[in-house]
Design a protein with these regions (language model features):
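Active-site rim/loop-helix segments in enzyme catalytic domains that contact anionic ligands
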Residues: 1-112, 139-143
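Metal-dependent de-N-acetylase/amidase catalytic core
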Residues: 1-5, 83-84, 94-266
Length: 266
């Protein structure tokens, strides 16, 4: 059996991008580990236990994940302003990439990881912490000698259609059309498409674990509320697939593979 490490920016990111794949791997007997760069909090915790890390632990348990590790950073936020660091920790966007990569590499070595799941170079929807996850993840794999890095992503063309459909339904989910052209990855870059329909119930439970976010008013909360209202069989159809782009693979080299342990052509 293999060990797969999924590197994420914030608690809740694991549910939509890799939740089904992690649940599927765990059920098959593989060891799965989530490493989260930030605790998801912007402010000073003043000695309090990070609420969102507790939610992540519940989400990971629903997915069957064996271990969760926090790298120790604070959320950097997604707005135009990068705020000052809280007194007790550094924002991930300000962290020295080499130091952060060293922390992640130590975990990869300890776990004897065979595959690292990370993010695409655009950071998906462009959050500064997601972009940094791509940079740090790629470097950590080099340091730890992990030869295969799969970037969790979405096919840009499908995501664009989804956003436009939501706008037509008057769901408050807006993107500048010029920004849509640089989100996630073009379909030609997708190397793996994993069928996770059977993991819909686990993903739903994992998503619901992030109550502090689901009950909010963010873009993620808008998506989460819609998904959680769906009956599980419908959710299985909506969230049927998870997509990955393998680092170093030849773009457009054929139909996406259906198993992350199958290497993409280089």
């Amino acid at each position: 059996m293999a060990t797969v490490v999924a590197f994420h920016a914030h608690p809740d990111d694991e549910t939509l991008l890799t939740g089904g794949t992690l649940a599927k791997l765990s059920a098959a007997g593989h060891r799965t580990v989530i490493v989260v760069a930030t605790d998801g909090h912007m402010a000073d915790l003043d000695g309090r236990k990070p609420l969102r890390l507790g939610e992540l632990a519940a989400s990971a348990a629903a997915l069957g994940v064996h271990r969760v590790v926090h790298l120790g950073y604070a959320d950097s936020g997604h707005g135009a302003v990068l705020y000052a660091d809280p007194p007790d920790r550094m924002r991930f966007a300000r962290a020295d990439p080499e130091e952060a990569a060293g922390r992640l590499a130590a975990i990869l070595r300890e776990e004897h990881a065979e595959i690292l799941l990370s993010y695409d170079r655009n950071g998906g929807y462009g959050h500064r912490d997601h972009v940094r996850v791509h940079q740090v993840g790629k470097r950590a794999a080099e340091l730890a000698g992990v030869s295969r890095v799969l970037d969790a992503t979405l096919p840009r063309e499908g995501y664009t259609r989804l956003v436009r459909s939501l706008e037509r339904l008057r769901v408050p989910f807006r993107y500048d059309p010029s920004v849509l052209a640089s989100l996630f990855s073009p379909r030609s870059a997708i190397t793996h498409r994993i069928d996770v329909a059977a993991q819909a119930a686990q993903r739903k439970t994992a998503l619901a674990a992030h109550r502090s976010i689901v009950e909010g008013s963010s873009r993620f909360a808008t998506i989460a509320k819609v998904l959680l209202r769906l009956p599980t069989p419908i959710l299985a159809r909506v969230m049927h697939w998870e997509w990955f782009a393998e680092e170093g693979a030849t773009p457009g080299s054929g139909a996406p593979l259906d198993d992350i342990f199958l290497p993409a052509p280089r």
